Amino acid sequence: MGSRIMHYCITVQLAEKLKINSELLHLGGLAPDAIGSDDQSKDRSHFITPKENGKKRINLGLFLEKYGDRMHDPFYRGFFSHLVADYLWYDCIMVKYFKPLSMEDRRKAEKIGYLDFRILNAKLIDHFNLTECKLTTIEQSEMDIIDMHALSGVIHQYEADFIIDPIAESSPLRLYSFEDILSYLDCSVKETVSRLEEINRETKI
C-alpha cells in the first residue's frame, strides 16, 4: 500500500485535473487508514473482500454500492482515490517487488520498503513541489468504517511527513525505483479520473 505522501500526491493532482478546491479531497485521500484496533478494521475501511481463489483484493464496486450517491462530495472522491491507488499498488508494485520472493525474503523486503518511504517522502515533496495543506478532522462522519480518533492521528502523521530528515533526503532508495513510483502515481491518477468521469456520466453529478 502506498504512503500518506503518495496519496497526497494523487489528491493534489486530482484537485488540479478535476478543479476541486477543498481540503476534504485530501482528507478523504488519507481517511481509509483511520482504522480502529481490531484485526478486521482495515479490511472494512478498504472494502477488502475474498476472491474465488481465497485471496483478498479491494472491491471498488462495493464502495460504490454503499457510497456511490455521495460521489459529488470531495471527501468521498478522495476516499475513492485512496482505494483505487491501493488496488493498483498490487498490480504496479507488489507483483514486481514482492510476489517473486519467498515469504522470508518478502518480510525482509517489506522492512526495507518501509524505510524507503521516508526517503520517498523527501523525493516526492521535492519532485512535485508539494506544500502542506492544513487538514482538520471532521466532527462526525456517516462512515461507520472510520475511527474519528484515528483520523486525527493520521493527520498528525501526515503533518510529520513534511518534516524532512536531511539524512533521508540525501539517501538512495534501497528497494524501489523512483521511476516505478512515479509511474504508479500517474497510473493511479489516470485511473481515478477515468472512473470518476464514468460515475459522472452515469449519475450526472
Task: Give the positions of each predicted feature.
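N-terminal leader/auxiliary helical segments
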Residues: M1-I205
